[in-house]
Amino acid sequence: MDRDDQLMTAFNYRAAEMCAKYKLILDLHGTHKPAGMNRTYPNVLNFEGVNGLEQMKWSPASVDQVKYDVMLPFTRQVSGPMDYTQGAMRNASKGNYYPCNSEPMSQGTRCRQLALYVVFESPFNMLCDTPSNYMREPESTGFIAEIPTVWDESIVLDGKMGEYIVTARRSGNVWYVGGITDWTARDIEVDCSFLGDKTYDATLFKDGANAHRAGRDYKWESVRVKNDSKLKIHLAPGGGFALKIK
């Protein structure tokens, strides 16, 4: 399906129609970017059409997935849902990544992987790593498992294509905020003025003190925020943060 010619496009539409007939959902992985099919067939939940995380199983270190990630919200994501397959628990800081098909790793930090579930729109999300790795990481796994896949409201709080982005999304009364950076470490200020007029409890996953050399390093903390709060968060090179507010 890795093509976008007339025959393949026609096949995708036939598959969507057949799945709708039998009340099945469809994830078109290995296909081209969406162009409105999910409006005609709402049972089509996701499309790949992206150089997703699976590429890290075989891509050389010269492939800069971190830079690519901060391009996607401004380019590919505009066309519709994206089956990027995030969620790696083996995370390599700059200079430590190498391709490994049997035990693949992501470029960048653990918190970057958590943030991608918020930054990228993906109504049919997945966990890309092995069950044993998730069992070893109950804090990260538990946080990912709670993140909704569809949203009532989305706001881009800050960003610059190819450098960084911070996105807030609401499901019901719960907000999630995710931020990622390129290989440049940076300090982000999250303006919480999008919140209502009360005090909220928040869970924050952010890059640990050693995340610049050990991508798995993170810090988890509970904070209280209001709509006049401005959270200052440091992002390691290739880093990120994920925040749940309720």
Where are these regions (language model features)?
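Carbohydrate-binding surface patches
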Residues: M161-D201, F241-A242
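Catalytic domains of carbohydrate-active enzymes that cleave complex glycans
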Residues: E103, R112-F124, C128-P131
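Conserved, mostly hydrophobic/aromatic
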Residues: L26, V119, V177, G238
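Aromatic- and carboxylate-enriched substrate-binding clefts and catalytic-loop regions
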Residues: M1-M105
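Acidic/polar loop patches that form or flank catalytic/metal-binding clefts of enzymes
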Residues: K23-G30, L53-K57, P123-E137, W151-I155, ...
